[in-house]
Amino acid sequence: AHRCEDKGYSCLTMPDHFDDQLAPVPALMTAANVTTNLRIGALVWDNDYKHPAVLAKELATMDVLSDGRLELGIGAGWMISDYEQMGIPYDSAKVRIDRFVEGLKVIKGAMAEGPFSFSGDHYTITHYNGTPKPVQAPCPPILIGGGGKRVLSIAAREADIVGINATMSAGVIGPDAFNTMTAEAVDEKVTIVREAAGARFNDIEMNVRAFLVSITDDAKQAASGIASMLGVERQMVEESPFALVGPTSKLIEDLLERRERWGFSYVIVGADDVDLFAPVVAALNGK
């Protein structure tokens, strides 16, 4: 957290899974407590792991204790291993997304002023006045990421920040997902968002997580190595917004071009890349 803030990063995120990681709520609150301006959020909370009214209370508390620095990332859930290990039914994508849509309504209702009631297929809330209320009224910025048409359309209508993801319908990251990370696939995903958002598109912050980062003077060799590892063509790695490969100067140019093409102004890199990527952050902050 200290490193991120000192090097100019604006937000620290972490996943919400049951594998080898810290629990996001206490970990992110610790990060907020030792920093001043760094924003915090999960990428993303899975709606199926907690009742949304319980999650809303935790998130509102985080926003209060961090003095309004929370980003509310939430999704329908996709990683099948989480569900299998915890004995949570891995329902069809339709059911999980339906439940997520209801969960988002519950979270917004719990954070809004006054009591609210809700009756859906998955959740029923009766005259509940959620407390505390978040500092960022009526709700912290909502981040929804998706790879398929339905979730991207929901994100376009409901989110402040829309994340463009690979398509994870298989429940794992594999060849099928890699095929949806091409520049052409991202063109199609952004078009879905633009059409579903309508007039509000210009108010949305577009987000992408760069999973493949290699800061090197030999961009071609690095891209070839990544392509070989993934079983894809080098050109795909060079053009995909999910990859950042090359020297600092090239990464700056690539990010500016991707902002122009897709609108990406919010780019996430992994913890291992924080130090090497810092000059790129310094060059682009405020631009």
Predicted regions and their residues:
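Active-site-adjacent structural elements that line small-molecule/cofactor binding pockets in enzymes
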Residues: A1-K287
